[in-house]
UniProtKB/Swiss-Prot annotation:
[4Fe-4S] cluster binds at residues 3, 6, 14, 20. InterPro entries: HCP/CODH (IPR004137), Hydroxylam_reduct (IPR010048), Prismane-like_a/b-sand (IPR016099), Prismane-like_sf (IPR011254), Prismane_a-bundle (IPR016100). The gene is hcp. The modification Cysteine persulfide is found at residue 392. Keywords: 4Fe-4S, Cytoplasm, Iron, Iron-sulfur, Metal-binding, Oxidoreductase. It is an enzyme of class 1 (oxidoreductase). The keyword Protease does not apply. Its cofactor is [4Fe-4S] cluster; hybrid [4Fe-2O-2S] cluster. Its EC number is 1.7.99.1. This is Hydroxylamine reductase. Hybrid [4Fe-2O-2S] cluster binds at residues 232, 256, 300, 392, 420, 445, 480, 482.
Length: 539
């Protein structure tokens, strides 16, 4: 295996076992699944870049399976490869052309055949040239992230055919020998498509569940048994809340599901009581103390402990060997969570690990409703600078940097955040500026879109020609592929001077990293003191 797609990849990439817990066989099967998706894209070129929505949505699902910490279940991945090959053959027959590339023509049906195929379709096979391979990796990981966002929107019935068309263009490009400038153009096109994907998901979520509003979320526990729901899928949240109503079972969010509390549609459920725990990487301890069932709707899963294995469930694209998987919902119906609910009734209430409050719900509609107050605070000097600290959290101690930055920033700064990076500072007592909290949480990682909308609105209000003239600095934490997608979206929107940490991606060669620095002033993080001083000076 060779996997370098996440921030915690070891130097040179993970080659024996992933830091995430993924073993060599799972890694190889995921490589083969990506190759099968590339085959679908190649065959779809016969439709002049257009692809039927059914196939586009399926590609989203295939790529989502391979996002870090999403699916470790070899049986499920093998079945997905079989489906992908059948889809590819269907597309090839409909297109009436047969591309010469092996990805469009190979066949197999067994796990052994898929593992054998992996040798020819690993990341290393993208190009013999390290720099071209680096650019192709950037494209692939960007597409993986936007596929996750697009899949969430599709679950709610929202689609954008331009995104599916980019799958065809982008994935096909991975199989071809293209020059660096053309690949760099595709990187930027991936960023443009990422903006579309995040806008689509924002539209899907808000039209379905309402615009997020300022909300105080409790972090303590009640006296009744509970179900803990983690991941990002709001439709799963809706199904679970409806089915648990009146059962005597409470529902708690974990990690990236925290922002579900901000949506008006979910506020009517009295048994939707709070958030339990912190970021994804501490789940092994928190799932143990929760006592009740856990539902993982997407990433992030860490290796499962025996102490809670019997009460942990997966659904959607998530999977883990030995865990019960809740099947997809039938057309027009809901998922059946009855087994989880009945198990919850037999469990003890959660053990309290903290008892406080978190304030969030500052997506673009809510912040723009406060625009006059924010603009006045900027003009008066009460707010000197905004610092965007969106992105991911991770287990390495180096991420203490983000806590320290939040504590070191002057009291006339406001932190704009989205994603699980917030857990590094969203429980600190950082105060407010004239009633505006100094940490404004927009929501999940895809809600970084809200931060971009807010920035563009402020640019308009202040009459600035360039988004980089705003008093906004970007100190982004990344971990997996959705953060890569967010980064590419920001670069496409013209944002420069982004700090990216805690380390630059392992898949970027020195030459490609230098190119990104030159084009976009992308920079690694430094010391807390130096970075805060530079950001406050507009650098």
């Amino acid at each position: 295996m060779h996997c370098d797609q996440c921030q915690e990849s070891i130097k040179g990439g993970c080659n024996v076992r992933g830091v995430c817990g993924k073993d060599e066989l799972t890694a190889k099967l995921q490589d083969t699944l990506i190759y099968a998706a590339e085959g679908i894209a190649l065959c779809a070129e016969g439709f002049e870049g257009k692809i039927d929505r059914k196939y586009g949505q399926f590609i989203s699902e295939c790529l989502f399976v391979t996002v870090t910490n999403t699916n470790f279940d070899d049986v499920a991945i093998v079945e997905q490869i079989r489906k992908a090959l059948a889809m590819r053959d269907e597309v090839r027959a409909l297109a009436g052309t047969t591309p010469a590339h092996d990805a469009a023509n190979w066949s197999g049906s067994t796990k052994e055949e898929f593992l054998a195929k992996a040798a020819a379709c690993s990341i290393d096979s993208l190009s013999a040239d390290p720099d071209l391979r680096s650019l192709k990796s950037l494209i692939l990981y960007g597409i993986k992230g936007l596929a996750a966002y697009t899949d969430h929107a599709a679950v709610l019935g929202y689609h954008d055919d331009d995104i599916y068309a980019f799958y065809v263009k982008g994935l096909s490009a991975l199989t071809k020998e293209l020059p660096a400038d053309e690949l760099l153009g595709l990187v930027m096109e991936c960023g443009a498509t990422a903006v579309k994907a995040m806008a689509l998901l924002d539209k899907a979520n808000t039209e379905t569940y309402g615009n997020p509003e300022i909300t105080t979320v409790k972090t303590g526990v009640g006296t009744r048994p509970g179900i803990l729901i983690s991941g990002h899928d709001l439709r799963d949240m809706e199904d679970l809340l409806k089915q648990t109503e009146g059962t005597g079972v409470d529902v708690y969010t974990h990690c990236e599901m925290l922002p579900a509390h901000y949506y008006p549609a979910f506020k009517k459920y009295d048994h939707f009581v709070g958030n339990y725990g912190n970021s994804w990487w501490s789940q092994d301890r928190e799932f143990e103390s929760f006592n009740g069932p856990i539902l993982m709707t997407t990433n992030c899963i860490v290796p499962v402990r025996e102490s809670y294995r019997g009460r942990m469930f997966t659904t959607g694209m998530a999977g883990y060997p030995g865990l019960k998987h809740i099947p997809a919902r039938p057309d027009g119906g809901s998922k059946d969570f009855s087994e989880i609910i009945e198990l919850a009734k037999t469990c003890k209430p959660p053990i309290e690990i903290e008892n406080g409050e978190i304030v969030g719900g500052f997506a673009h509609t809510q912040v723009l409703a406060l625009a006059d107050k924010v603009v006045d605070a900027v003009k008066s000097g009460a707010i000197r600078r905004f610092v965007v600290m969106a992105g991911c959290d991770g287990r390495h101690n180096s991420r203490q940097y983000y806590t320290d930055v939040a504590e070191t920033l002057p009291k006339d700064t406001v932190i704009l955040t989205a994603g699980c990076a917030k857990y590094r500072y969203n429980k600190l007592e950082l105060g407010d500026i004239g009633g505006i909290p100094r940490v404004l949480d927009a929501g999940q990682c895809n809600d970084s879109y809200s931060l971009a909308v807010i920035a563009m609105k402020l640019q308009e209000v202040f009459g600035l020609e360039n988004i980089n003239d705003l008093p906004i600095s970007y100190d982004i934490a990344w971990y997996e592929q959705k953060a890569v997608t967010v980064l590419l979206a920001l670069l496409f929107l013209g944002v420069k001077g982004i700090r990216l940490g805690p380390t630059l991606p392992e898949f970027l060669t020195p030459n490609i990293a230098t190119t990104l620095v030159k084009l976009f002033d992308l920079k690694p993080i430094g010391t807390v003191e130096a970075d805060v001083e530079a950001m406050m000076a507009g650098n």
